[in-house]
Amino acid sequence: MLQPKRTKFRKMHKGRNRGLAQGTDVSFGEFGLKACGRCRLTARQIEAARRAMTRAIKRQGKVWIRVFPDKPITEKPLEVRMGKGKGNVEYWVALIQPGKVLFEMAGVPEETAREAFKLAAAKLPVGTTFVTKTVM
């Protein structure tokens, strides 16, 4: 699963997921899966969506993952009293804003790409839409 190789600090504040998305256009492939809302995508969810897509296109074409989980989420163990410091890092998330392109695909027909993205979207906790590359 995806996670940073090294970070400056082990743990991070919770923070807020506000603002506008960067990376709202299809850059690498022909088709894309764009987020319609805000969420935190875990590394497991990204991997599950990637597997669903690659199986649907039968390993033809190319898939780009445009998000990376770089925020550590900590949890305290079960039945532990409050206090005594921050919990251990349990998993990594990527903060998603509306309009962010999550995945891109090229080298497959549009119908195949739509079907693959539909399967991938079922694994994600946010509403998504299918987008195509616009040539200026």
From Swiss-Prot:
The keyword Ribonucleoprotein applies. The keyword RNA-binding applies. Gene3D superfamilies: Ribosomal protein L10e/L16 (3.90.1170.10). Keywords: Ribonucleoprotein, Ribosomal protein, RNA-binding, rRNA-binding, tRNA-binding. It holds the Pfam family Ribosomal_L16. Disulfide bonds: none annotated. One of its GO terms (cellular component) is cytosolic large ribosomal subunit. One of its GO terms (biological process) is translation. One of its GO terms (molecular function) is rRNA binding. InterPro entries: Ribosomal_uL16, Ribosomal_uL16_bact-type, Ribosomal_uL16_CS, Ribosomal_uL16_dom, Ribosomal_uL16_sf. Binds 23S rRNA and is also seen to make contacts with the A and possibly P site tRNAs. HAMAP family: Ribosomal_uL16. Belongs to the universal ribosomal protein uL16 family. PANTHER family: 50S/60S RIBOSOMAL PROTEIN L16 (PTHR12220), LARGE RIBOSOMAL SUBUNIT PROTEIN UL16M (PTHR12220:SF13). Part of the 50S ribosomal subunit. This is Large ribosomal subunit protein uL16. It comes from Yersinia pestis.
